[in-house]
Amino acid sequence: LPIDLFHERLILNDFETIEDVEKFFSDHYSVLSNRYGVLLFLYSILFTKGYEKLLSEINDISEPLIHSNFGYGSQSLINLFLTGRAVAHVFDNDQDIGGMKLLGINRQSDIGFITLMEQLRYVQVGSFYKNPKYSIWVLASETHLTVLFSNEKSLVSPETAAEHARRIFNQYDTENTGN
């Protein structure tokens, strides 16, 4: 099926409950496992989020969600998949930098995210991503994403009082002085 014909045949379904969604995907699992399954999953997430809400979360609407030359998903797209928010940053909470509000990860994620870019000091991943609810992480390298997981439950834990205090302090310590 050519891609243009695929798009012509798309049908938008509305569901009232999560049970309806689960039943639909259970009954139509083969649709998601076919040639355009990932694209259908992407469309499902984007339509569920809604155009207006998506635009309100993306800092730079000129940045594409998918890189046109290489097909890489943007950080906003990765964050949308992992947290439900299409924010461009991986730090904890929102930050105000010189009057510009930068949206970050606003709560502990079910699935974590870590990146080689942090080791290179390009970004700082917050504790909400580093310490997810489940011991599953997406690891980003320069060219691809890898899913890591473990049955070892001790790798993740709820945020401690000290971690909570440090996170709150860091919200107000915008220059990272530590004082």
Which sequence ranges carry the predicted segments?
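Cysteine-dependent deubiquitinase/ubiquitin-like isopeptidase catalytic cores across multiple families
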Residues: 1-172, 176-179
